[in-house]
Amino acid sequence: MPASKKISDRNHLGQVFDKLLNQIGESEEFELPEWLNKGKPTPYIFIRRNIYLTKKVKRRVEDDGIFCSCSSSSPGSSSTVCGSNCHCGMLFSSCSSSCKCGSECNNKPFQQRHVKKMKLIQTEKCGSGIVAEEEIEAGEFIIEYVGEVIDDKTCEERLWKMKHRGETNFYLCEITRDMVIDATHKGNKSRYINHSCNPNTQMQKWIIDGETRIGIFATRGIKKGEHLTYDYQFVQFGADQDCHCGAVGCRRKLGVKPSKPKIASDEAFNLVAHELAQTLPKVHQNGLVNRHIDAGKSWNNLSQRDTCSRNCIGVVIRLSRPTSDRCFGLVRHFDEYSRKHSVMFEDGVTEFVDMSREDWEIV
């Protein structure tokens, strides 16, 4: 291109730029809008179901998984339709399509439960938050925690990138040993539920047709306008974060709860008996009806210990196993010789568990 042509073009662009400056007027200091200074909710793409960026588990076929003894409530029948006492439900596993209750089956979480009404708000100290827009009863399903399902390697890479950017809001929830739900970029309102050391909801891990999904359920009655919270049990990544939940007994820092101390075998039996006495007013097992066990009682003979072991049958327990996918189990049998309980887990596998060596609790 001739030099004269280049100069002509530059002069023309300069004239256009000068004209724009005259139209703009005097320069002013740039300030962010007030709504940005107060804290804008982090942008994300709304989704209804998890999006898998890793290999998705195969769907369960009709004959896979665990089964319950419930059956359809036909006229004149004393059978019970799947409900709170369904073995599948007690193990946080949905019934399969081969359930004898058919269309009457009530153990179809997520599929049959409607998301509760809730509203996104800005809090004074905790950024964005969620309040209930309707009354919620204890035990009711509130919302599913959804996002991108990634593996541990991808999770670690994303965490380091966020750390280098100085971000402090994490939306990660581990569902299995090598599978994490990341709601940073895609999710729903559940990502805005804040932490509390005394929460009114909890996360529950359910197996739906072979897929592990996370639901948020009310642990007590929640009033309209009340903040929804759950215990993050946050695994620290970087500097400590202060807790501003304001609950009685606040731990002051976001972090994992201290684990329960390991207890001796006899004490483990006593603890089971104590919790059973509070949660199971009547025991129907092997003909034993309303046979209570006193808390703190010393087990001096095998018959007394056997009574406790029989009363444990049918109880759902939660085991703290960071490196295992098997956390929830149904106690099915007690072996007096080995002093171990036979526990069936949500994937249908049965193990003999020494409860004196496990960190556990009754669900």
Swiss-Prot record:
GO CC aspect terms: chromosome, centromeric region; endoplasmic reticulum; nucleus; plasmodesma
Alphabetical list of Gene3D superfamilies matching this protein: SET domain
CDD domains: SET_ASHR3-like, Tudor_Agenet_AtEML-like
This protein's UniProt keywords: Centromere, Chromatin regulator, Chromosome, Methyltransferase, Nucleus, S-adenosyl-L-methionine, Transferase
A GO molecular function held by the record: protein-lysine N-methyltransferase activity
InterPro entries tied to this protein: ASHR3-like_SET, AWS_dom, Hist-Lys_N-MeTrfase_SET2_plant, Post-SET_dom, SET2_Histone-Lys_MeTrsfase, SET_dom, SET_dom_sf
Primary role: Histone methyltransferase.
Protein family per UniProt: Belongs to the class V-like SAM-binding methyltransferase superfamily. Histone-lysine methyltransferase family. SET2 subfamily.
The protein's name in its UniProt record: Histone-lysine N-methyltransferase ASHH3
Organism of derivation: Arabidopsis thaliana (Mouse-ear cress)
Gene (UniProt): ASHH3
